[in-house]
């Protein structure tokens, strides 16, 4: 049995001949109570808007001139969410509470939320938004769905990816981070994380020059959420083994 306390599966090689997939199940009702990742996304958006990347003082940065760190507010901003899944729906609640107008785009036309405005294309969502949040599940169909063209629409905007690195054309992303006219970018995920993200060294070489925040896939890494998901997995495994023995 393979049990994984994650929402993504691209770290499990289910094509491996040694792994016999009998069934694949997600405990989505339980996951609705797990808030670590949406809280991280919300925190990243505030960090970008308020220029925390450069405003945190340290031994190396003693600049007390607040005018150089002047930022923006969530109140009155337009937030665009790509993917109205579990995390997307929670984010709608968070940003509404702070006075933002929330837009969303999802290929599933049945998904809706009274607190957000549906947009009919990804391009229109990006154009309508001040902050663009990528929050889709990774599937082979989503591989590289964000290309150089979509990235070019982010000029003058903030962008957050906590989905998976593989949903982006990362070569185009690196080029855009170096040359684009965006306001800020936050990345919690990169491709090939298990083997060491190939893009990481290049990003770290330039992130200090831009309003770019990189976190090591810590979206779900809180004591509370990890404890609850790990306990849930043990509980479900025990139930499965008990049924097999019966």
Where are these regions (language model features)?
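Rossmann-like dinucleotide/phosphate-binding beta-alpha-beta segment
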Residues: 67-156
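Mid-domain beta-loop-alpha active-site segment that forms a flexible
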Residues: 32-40, 44, 86, 224-236
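Active-site regions of enzymes building and remodeling cell-envelope glycoconjugates
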Residues: 1, 16-22, 113-122, 209-212
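Rossmann-like dinucleotide-binding domain for NAD(H)/NADP(H)
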Residues: 156-158, 163-246
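Short glycine-/small-residue-rich Rossmann-like dinucleotide-binding loops
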Residues: 7, 130, 135-138, 163-164, ...
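Phosphate/diphosphate ligand-binding glycine-rich loop within oxidoreductases
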Residues: 1-56
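Short, hydrophobic beta-strand segments that form beta-sheet elements in well-ordered domains
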Residues: 1-4, 99-106, 185-188
